[in-house]
Amino acid sequence: MNNPIPSNLKSEAKKAAKILREFTEITSRNGPDKIIPAHVIAKAKGLAVLSVIKAGFLVTARGGSGIVLARLPDGKWSAPSAIGIAGLGGGFEIGIEVSDLVIILNYDRAVEAFAKGGNLTLGGNFTVAVGPLGRNLEGNVSLRSSAAVFTYCKSRGLFAGISLEGSCLIERKETNRKFYCQDIRAYDILFGDVPQPAQAEDLYEILNSFTEKYETEGQRINLKKVAREQRKAKELPPKPSSRPQPSRPPVQLNAGSQSNRNEYKLYPELSSYHEKTGSLSQPIEVTALYSFEGQQPGDLNFQAGDRIIVISKTDSNFDWWEGKLRGQTGIFPANYVTMN
């Protein structure tokens, strides 16, 4: 485990880079399903990396040190700000344990709360959840979660659950002053008033690698999606080439005339169409084998698996039939459905 005793910012940045590698690289102890997904860090608005010591005898006390960084508007990472963590917990625990923590700040407001106030209490106004694991995890998992903060904890080299509710991230002002050679607040550091320090080069190298991995994964997912759509398009049966056409152009309807209102409809009740179709005294039901997205007014949209009531049909399955679904009436390719 890494040293939880507070040290200078250069050492804290070096420790943070080491911890991030341990949390994100596949090893004999960390399989592909036991690493922080690249997209979680690539999409983070901020992150904190710390080493924590927990001691307990009836009541547990937690303390440690690390750094916090924020995502700048241009997508780059800010300079690091030194932080500490402190908290108390209940439960009958006896002993001492050292853990490494990675805390992901998913929303700007979580970063701002720390930057403006100089500390951030986990829980309360900010929901805390154990972060997702797994290299192949879909990138939208973090988007589906409403948690403002993700936490990852490793104890003795293994991921472990840890409750950080009520723990507080605290700004270490004196450590920042010594490193940056000026009185400077976390707010100014995290919002880009100082450049990335050369002493933290290793840290930025690994942080930038997550963005590259995420973009590579995104390209791979997009390529798979395109290939899947192309295969699906090839598998779809061709639509009938000819559509039922109106025998005359639409007439101007008189709002007060019910007979005029029924005189013209886009597809149903056209004499030229019904000469070759059969109106069904007992409507039959068909099930969609494929999804169909209409391309012209009067087409009936449906998804694979939908049940459609057939209003009128021809003897050919390679033709346009008329049906009704969810209160909508329109025509559809008959070879996209099967009889129930």
UniProtKB/Swiss-Prot annotation:
GO terms (molecular function) for this protein are: phosphatase binding; phosphatidylinositol binding
What GO biological process, any one, is recorded here? phosphatidylinositol biosynthetic process
- Show where the SH3 domain sits: 281-340
Cellular component aspect of the GO annotation: ruffle membrane
So which domain of life are we looking at? Eukaryota
Where is the segment annotated Disordered? Answer: 224-259
Disulphide linkage map: none
- Composition-biased stretches, type Basic and acidic residues, lie in 226-237
Question: What keywords tag this UniProt record?
Answer: SH3 domain
Establish whether keyword Transcription is in the entry.
Answer: no
Give me the stretches of Pro residues compositional bias: 238-249
| Sequence similarity | Belongs to the SH3YL1 family.
How it assembles, according to the record, is: Interacts with SH3D19.
The entry's protein name is SH3 domain-containing YSC84-like protein 1
